[in-house]
Amino acid sequence: MLDRIKVCFTESIQTQIAAAEALPDAISRGAIAMVQSLLNGNKILCCGNGTSAANSQHFAASMINRFEAERPSLPAIALNADNVVLTAIANDRLHEEIYAKQVRALGQAGDVLLAISTRGNSRDIVKAVESAVTRDMTIVALTGYDGGELAGLLGPQDVEIRIPSHRSARIQEMHMLTVNCLCDLIDNTLFPHQND
């Protein structure tokens, strides 16, 4: 058992090292897209399933409340946070519409959709991205493995932050770190002296 614990830590560290080499440009571009959207008076919608839903809610909470320093609230909505809306849509329509319908209702040109999917193949996340494209929104996608179907939907203005791993647990750990990096970059760009 102790050896297995060391393997988990070692894999996580190796994935972090690989991500630190591969992802800074994509994370920076994702943060810039979000900052520009917020400066233009727009908002960030985010969604995910399971652990990705938790990362989505963590991002929205960090925008609305604060990340590490006190600052004004920033507009972000975790589409997976309202169980009444989710179950109403799932009950009346296909489950794959639970986020897409909300994107069509709430999304506007200039908004950002933060779409989080470990494999990039979750139908409800794919449908949300397709709806965001029709609303002229920018997509920042957090993926892993080969990026899945999600990667093929992204245009030149969109950003894929693909974790260099084929292990779901490692990808999800890195998604949380990436969300924290995005929050840090947004805060330090919009409020550069708040952490002083």
Swiss-Prot record:
CDD domains: SIS_GmhA. One of its GO terms (biological process) is carbohydrate derivative metabolic process. GO terms for molecular function: carbohydrate derivative binding. Keywords: DNA replication. Residues 34-196 form the SIS domain. It comes from the Bacteria. InterPro entries: DiaA, GmhA/DiaA, SIS_dom, SIS_dom_sf, SIS_GmhA/DiaA_subfam. Belongs to the SIS family. DiaA subfamily. Homotetramer; dimer of dimers. Required for the timely initiation of chromosomal replication via direct interactions with the DnaA initiator protein. This is DnaA initiator-associating protein DiaA. It comes from Pectobacterium atrosepticum (strain SCRI 1043 / ATCC BAA-672) (Erwinia carotovora subsp. atroseptica).
